[in-house]
Amino acid sequence: MERRSGRIFRNDSGVAAVEFALIVPILCVVLFGIIDGWSFVSSSLSMRASVKTAANLVMEGATDDAATQAVALSSWENHPEGAQVTLGRKYMCGITVVDASSLCNGGTKAPSVFVEIKATATWSPPFIFGAFSLSREIGHQEVIRVR
């Protein structure tokens, strides 16, 4: 008779539900972490692509920095609010920074021209929870020697 009562009280039908209830929160945290990581990586890659677009324009001979900046910002897919692309030109004779109108080597050589393209933005995670709720600054910089 003891054997029969042991089988009655030993019911395993709820074990799977309890295991599922214990595992689901962990799986949700992992899923949200993967989504946040993917969002960060795709934002960074999109930003790098926009800087590359601007760099290609400069290497093809674009001289209007404002237009190049606008093209870079418009090619940045799903850019965050406050995203910025800046272009700066630096004229150098050797290791010395000079004016655009200066000539090097006693007036015989034009200075080297370097164009610095810099993109910055603040990335915010799509899901805000726990330690993953922090926004981060992302940026990419490229320097091109034009002449």
Where does each model-flagged region fall?
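Alpha-helical assembly-interface signal, strongest on the long, hydrophobic N-terminal helix that forms
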Residues: M1-S75
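Short, conserved structural patches
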Residues: E2-R3, S44, K52-R147
